[in-house]
């Protein structure tokens, strides 16, 4: 058997049907993400992307099959313990009123300023924070109303990194970033020391071109698993997504 110590996330014939729903949201999903890998998740609206990643921090439990996190069945973890190891950054950035510093300290209240700046650098937020008159002490309005969409997204990614998770899930959370910032963020995450495993859920194929594996979902089923170049040859659904974006000019590097 494979060495489970090297596995960050393993799905073994996983299906998920939400309570009260007639049809399953996920059907028979199997894959293994090794520690340190970047995993892309792509598919059309309603394909099951959020359902898949919701199983990793145990927002829900699989109806069938097994989900293993860091070598153990997900159900063996108390949810609170799992949330320390798995950080999820949603598309809609949630920020509370206070300052940039207090916003980041939600990730880890004992973090030193050096840790905050390191997280801001990785999240491509350090430059805009430095440009603020008060830096880390700059006020943040409730919901981050005084920040742009891209600034809010970068701050919530930095906040997640301050918690030093083992698994980071970006659920379409770079959607407000331009391509250059998005690419710089992915490069910085890949360069982090240690074995951080990153799941990037994206509508943009261009954001996933350098992922170690890409999971392609269609109607709750996995219709492709592999690297970008291979999927273009073997997975019609992926090829179609990429071609439609490439025509529109969305698939810039």
What annotation goes with each model-predicted range?
Residues 2-253:
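ABC-type nucleotide-binding domain
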């Amino acid at each position: 058997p494979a060495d489970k110590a090297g596995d960050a996330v393993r799905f073994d014939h996983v299906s998920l049907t939400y309570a009260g729903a007639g049809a399953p949201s996920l059907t028979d999903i199997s894959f293994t993400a090794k520690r340190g890998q970047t995993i892309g998740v792509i598919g059309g609206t309603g394909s099951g992307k959020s359902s898949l990643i919701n199983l990793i921090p145990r927002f829900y439990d699989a109806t069938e099959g097994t989900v293993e996190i860091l070598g153990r069945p997900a159900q063996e973890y108390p949810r609170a313990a799992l949330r320390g190891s798995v950080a999820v950054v949603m598309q809609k950035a949630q920020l509370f009123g206070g300052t940039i510093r207090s916003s980041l300290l939600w990730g880890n209240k004992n973090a030193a300023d050096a840790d905050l700046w390191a997280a801001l650098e990785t999240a491509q937020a350090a430059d805009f924070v430095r440009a603020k008159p008060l830096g880390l002490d700059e006020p943040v309005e409730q919901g981050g109303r005084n920040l742009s969409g891209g600034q809010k997204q970068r701050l919530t990614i930095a906040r997640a990194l301050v918690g030093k998770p083992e698994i980071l899930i970006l659920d379409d959370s770079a959607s407000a970033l331009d391509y250059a910032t998005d690419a710089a963020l992915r490069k910085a995450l890949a360069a982090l020391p240690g074995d951080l495993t990153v799941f990037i859920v994206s509508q943009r194929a261009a954001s996933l071109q350098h992922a170690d594996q890409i999971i392609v979902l269609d109607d709750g089923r996995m219709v492709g698993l592999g690297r970008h170049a291979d999927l273009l040859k073997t997975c019609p659904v992926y090829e179609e997504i990429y071609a439609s974006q490439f025509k529109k000019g969305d698939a810039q590097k």
